[in-house]
Amino acid sequence: MKPVIALVGRPNVGKSTLFNRLTRSRDALVADLPGLTRDRHYGEGRVGGERPYLVVDTGGFEPVAKDGILFEMARQTRQAVEESDVIVFIVDGRNGLAPQDKSIADYLRKTGRPIFLVVNKAEGMKYTNVAADFYELGLGDPRAISAAHGDGVTEMINEALDVAYAGQPEESDEEKAQHGIKIAIVGRPNVGKSTLVNTLIGEDRVIAFDMPGTTRDSIYVDFERQGKKYTLIDTAGLRKRGKVFEAIEKFSVVKTLQSISDANVVILLLDARQDISEQDAHIAGFVVEQGRALVVGVNKWDGLDPHVRERTKSDLQRKLKFLEFAKFHFISAAEKTGIGPLMRSVDDAYKAAMSKLPTPKLTRALIEAVEFQQPRRRGPVRPKLRYAHQGGQNPPIIVIHGNALDAVTDTYKRYLENRFRETFALTGTPLRIEFRSSTNPYADKD
């Protein structure tokens, strides 16, 4: 599971600036939780090498607030701290130590989480001057950074990740071998995730084992269906009680994002009786960003008026158009209808995601696509697409070589993607296409 780094501090110390720096984007949000003024924002960490992690940006923290907006912001921050593996406590190097900093430090110490004290806005200042005040907090050596300019940020986050990953358990090869296709069932609260879980697991409720982490346990439930092995990743809050699993419908953004990253195939469950929300689209967007195979289940389809069904289908096509690669199934988890086709699509999506695409076949498909429709010229140059090979699996990556490929339009790229999908039956998985141009300065102009 990806570790979680929580950014905590009083208002205006630079938490959002650091969040944007770590996610390398001002719009890298993958999920928002509704609140009063400032919500918890979750993003994919992109600074710190190859180690994946999630970043949580919290509102300004007033730990002693008793009511109103400040109380709500404090509640949001406490929830983020509870979900985190490491806390980055940010203070303001320009304004110095504030009484609120002391209150926050007192609270954070009681959590038992690893804490990195970070002095922001330290650009152009001597470390000894910046750090002096903050030793009083008793949280070890302060780390001086400038979130706005990036100074010290990479070193700081790498140290935090060292600590976070030290607490992450590694699955043994034997444990990995026990698993079938890893499935994450994700969606908003009350869309029927726990009902679908119980329908899939049936009466057996077979092996469950915990992999202890630093702050949370991840539960995997192995089950068989029609002779095939699957492993359900706990997203609905499964907990064993006696010989039975109790499904607790408690939505956790962190749990959802971690489960998506860990899965082979994601089932995005929607409620046919509710409009598609921003939260649904955010979750779907994260699935695509992570390159995970996807099947969409539209639940509670039974008993719906035909006009409502048509309106729902139209709404899905309009709001989730970017999921055209995925199969949509209209099901009732409670009535156990549509579950068989849903699971067959899970199998197909996994097979597509893990496809091995031979270079000769890829190149032949590329040549046929170009012969049917050539890319447009850009000025005097027409892109020349020469050959293709596979660059990875889960999701499949197709690397195309040629000349002047930076002139290939997004429209033509989508055309190629659709041709490859059709040729190699790549339904249910995102598909990445990468272009690598020749550096030959004497490449032919068409």
UniProtKB/Swiss-Prot annotation:
Residues 355-439 form the KH-like domain. GTPase that plays an essential role in the late steps of ribosome biogenesis. GTP 2 binds at residues 187-194, 234-238, 299-302. Belongs to the TRAFAC class TrmE-Era-EngA-EngB-Septin-like GTPase superfamily. EngA (Der) GTPase family. Gene3D superfamilies: 3.30.300.20, P-loop containing nucleotide triphosphate hydrolases (3.40.50.300). The gene is der. Residues 3-168, 181-354 form the EngA-type G domain. GTP 1 binds at residues 9-16, 57-61, 120-123. HAMAP family: GTPase_Der. PANTHER family: GTPASE DER. This is GTPase Der.
